[in-house]
Amino acid sequence: MEVRIEPYEVHQLDAVIRLSLQAWAPVFDSIEQMMDFDVYRELYPDWRVSQRQAVEGVCAAEDTPVWVAIAAGAVLGFVAVKLDVEPNVGEIYMLAVEPEFQGRGIGSALIKFALNWMTGAGMSVAMVATGGDPGHAPARRTYEKLGFRILPLAQYYKKL
């Protein structure tokens, strides 16, 4: 399967939203299992709505470049990047691959493309934030395989 990475276009929004919601469903299931039920419901009353809005916002933002992975005319994944030019840090801000095509190198290809783009934009460090829950384990393996190193961070929540 030949995959091309090209700039996101507005007509691809529905496909990007659809694949991202499918890709992130196991992640939110995992988060729900790890968090106190009341806290989870407070933070994510309807994660699909909030994630849809987040993807729409990222795809519309002029300062957030987005690329899509295309094969056989279908959008199979996307990556969004944010730059912080003061410390020269580029961030893999969003990444998702159609679940049926995960594990085939599409996510890695999107990340490598984004890293090359960041280098060309003058960034000297790349970062990505991801969850420590089981649902994010495949993402963590991919980032580590591509040379990212983890900085452990603990985040605690309590229902008030």
Residue ranges and their predicted role:
Residues E2-R4:
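Extreme N-terminal starter segment of soluble prokaryotic enzymes
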Residues E6-P7, R104:
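Helix-turn-helix-type domain boundary/helix-start signal
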Residues P7-Y93, E98, I111-K112, W117, ...:
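Acetyl-CoA-dependent GNAT
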Residues K82, A129, A154:
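Conserved residues at the C-terminal ends of beta-strands
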Residues L83, E98-R104, G135:
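Active-site acidic-Proline motif in GNAT/NAT acetyltransferases
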Residues V97, G103-N116, R141, K145:
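Conserved acetyl-CoA-binding loop-helix of GNAT-fold acetyltransferases
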Residues Q102, M127-A139, Y157-L160:
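Conserved beta-strand-loop-alpha-helix junction that forms the acyl-donor binding cleft
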Residues S108, G120, S124, G132-P152:
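Conserved active-site alpha-helix within GNAT-family acetyltransferase domains
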